[in-house]
């Protein structure tokens, strides 16, 4: 079957509930991202059941919003917007963008920019004035996505993460 002339269908949405199919697709996309070095903290994919439980848990936490991206109706990436804890009244104006990834097989279609744009729209609709995020310095494509949307780097941590016994630089943005 030829894909010549195929126009990829892309979409991004904030979701409250995931179907079992969604959880499976999200787990597969996250695993692919982890294996390509872009796995929001994981260095190696956990067992499938652990990954699936992780995504089930995300939808149970009221202070988390899950944003998913689809390529040809298959989940290909996501991120989360998290609220500060209730006891942190001094920072209630800001939220955190976390667990951002796009599976390697879905890159190059603009999904990363769409995910970040949806995150910004969601944060604004929830009354947040600022989005904070942090990222390993090795995550070049994620950094490009954030900077293209106007996020400004405000800090660097030389000991942000440890990969294969080596410390990895991390960047903080708002």
Give residue ranges: language-model regions:
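Polar low-complexity intrinsically disordered regions
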Residues: 1-8, 72, 101
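C-terminal "cap" of GNAT-fold acetyltransferases
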Residues: 3-9, 95, 129-132, 136-143, ...
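Alpha-helix termini
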Residues: 50, 54, 90, 112, ...
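Conserved phosphate-binding and hydrolysis motifs of nucleotide-dependent enzymes
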Residues: 73, 77, 110-112, 150
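Conserved glycine-rich acetyl-CoA-binding loop
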Residues: 90, 103-117, 124-126, 137-144, ...
């Amino acid at each position: 079957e030829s894909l010549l002339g195929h126009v990829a269908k892309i979409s991004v949405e904030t979701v409250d509930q995931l179907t079992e199919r969604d959880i499976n697709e999200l787990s597969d996309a996250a695993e692919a991202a982890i294996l390509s070095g872009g796995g929001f903290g994981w260095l190696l994919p956990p067992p499938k059941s652990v990954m699936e439980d992780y995504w089930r848990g995300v939808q149970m936490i009221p202070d988390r919003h899950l944003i998913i991206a689809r390529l040809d109706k298959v989940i290909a990436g996501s991120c989360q917007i998290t609220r500060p804890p209730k006891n942190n009244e001094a920072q209630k104006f800001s939220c955190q963008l976390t667990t951002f990834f796009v599976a390697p097989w879905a890159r190059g279609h603009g999904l990363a920019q769409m995910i970040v744009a949806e995150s910004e729209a969601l944060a604004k609709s929830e009354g947040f004035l600022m989005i904070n995020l942090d990222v390993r310095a090795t995550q070049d494509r994620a950094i490009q996505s954030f900077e293209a949307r106007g996020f400004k780097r405000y800090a660097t941590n030389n000991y942000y993460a440890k990969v294969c016994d080596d410390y990895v630089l991390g960047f903080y943005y708002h």
